Amino acid sequence: MADDKGQMMWGGRFAATPSAIMEEINASLDIDRRMAEEDVAGSRAHADMLAEMGILSVADNEAIQGGLDAVIEEMRAGTFPFRRELEDIHMNVEARLKELIGEPAGRLHTARSRNDQVITDFRLWTRRALDETGQLVAGLQAMLVRRADENTSTVMPGFTHLQTAQPVTLGHHLLAYVEMLERDRSRLLDCAVRLNECPLGAAALAGTGFPIDRDMTAEALGFARPMANSLDAVSARDFALEALSSLSIAATHLSRLAEEIVLWTSPQFGFARLSDQWSTGSSIMPQKRNPDAAELIRAKASLITGHFSALQGAIKALPLAYAKDLQDDKRLTFDAFDTFNLCVRAMTGMIETISFKPDAMRAAAAKGFSTATDLADWLVRELGMPFRDAHHVTGRIVARAEAKGVDLADLPLKEMQAVHSAITQEVYGVLSVEASAASRTSYGATSPVRVAEQVAQWKQRLRVE
């Protein structure tokens, strides 16, 4: 940082100023100015503590608090005079404070280093971001629950290997993502609990000889406690790494849902139609309706995972305590949160407005011998057949149906009896896709009754109207 005479605030031992390129690579203001509110909050708490401990006079603290009021008002009004040559938000705030109140501004940094100042701001910002992102995820969950509630009995094919497996209900399918997102939200909340320790007072790395009260500043900033080791306090970035890990996992779940939207809205599947709000066209092919938002979510999920890997790579070989490698931790973290939150908003909008096609889903569910397991189960229940024998018999019946080009429900009884003579007309009662889905009544299963129960539980948990 440069003072009014152009001298860097850390430049007392240097004979020359940094080159323009050095200033360019060293500057972080464009990124960390987002922590302005957190920086001012940290300075307020620090100044109050210094005054309480008699390190700072009451008059100086009053001047500092008044100056910080003016600083934050300027920032909120968009009139704060940011100066890029001052490197970062922390030095910009201090320089402006000095312009506003004079000498007392220079006392604010007593018993504090930029090392503990920066990481305090970063923890405060990340804690708030985790809470905001968790609320967005809950909003997407609520939207999925609403759409599931509309489709508790809508039958569609369930897939393994992207091949028709068994009939399921659309409501059940959508609730699977609600469960995934709940784990994602839980990880975000857990991360917020672990990061909620205050590094302020660790100073550069070894603590300070001033009689500070770290419990006081921790409480003022809403932290559970001060961090117990000053080296760890300024060195640790695992809280950011954990946040990016949680975002990466959650983004992976968004990507899976996005991929299914791409598939379902294709003419080959025809299960759904995206609204015009969430579709784009082609510059040459007038008939096209492209699911660009879903495709972009897939791509951006990879970007978030890349940010996690980049931060992990930056941290993995760093000795204690601080190194400038850590400056980009905020660039990666801020962009990961921004990107993820954008994806959640886009996905919520798509789910809210997507039109499902129950008839097409039902027709697809009836193909591919999706009720073969139901036939095998019937052989076990009604004829007392061991399941492995029933599996073999069913396979032979499927082969006959395939040879005749019909589904199991349309295969004549005599064809089934040619495989096993004890099969009766009653078998057809389990071979419709509706009967198949309805029969899956175990806890967590796909029957409309079970799905309705799950919807009711989620409505209560998420307070969905």
Curated annotation (Swiss-Prot):
Reactions listed under catalytic activity: 2-(N(omega)-L-arginino)succinate = fumarate + L-arginine
One MF term in the entry's GO annotations: argininosuccinate lyase activity
Pathway(s) it belongs to: Amino-acid biosynthesis; L-arginine biosynthesis; L-arginine from L-ornithine and carbamoyl phosphate: step 3/3
Organism classification: Bacteria, Pseudomonadati, Pseudomonadota, Alphaproteobacteria, Hyphomonadales
Principal cellular location given in the protein's record: cytoplasm
Location(s) in or outside the cell: Cytoplasm
Enzyme Commission numbers on file: 4.3.2.1
Similarity comment: family membership: Belongs to the lyase 1 family. Argininosuccinate lyase subfamily.
Gene designation per UniProt: argH
NCBIfam families the UniProt entry points to: argH
Annotated Pfam families: ASL_C2, Lyase_1
Domain of life: Bacteria
GO BP field: arginine biosynthetic process via ornithine; L-arginine biosynthetic process
Enzyme class: lyase
Stated name of the protein: Argininosuccinate lyase
GO CC annotation terms, alphabetical: cytosol
Keyword annotations of the record: Amino-acid biosynthesis, Arginine biosynthesis, Cytoplasm, Lyase
Organism from which the protein derives: Hyphomonas neptunium (strain ATCC 15444)
Keyword Amino-acid biosynthesis applies: yes
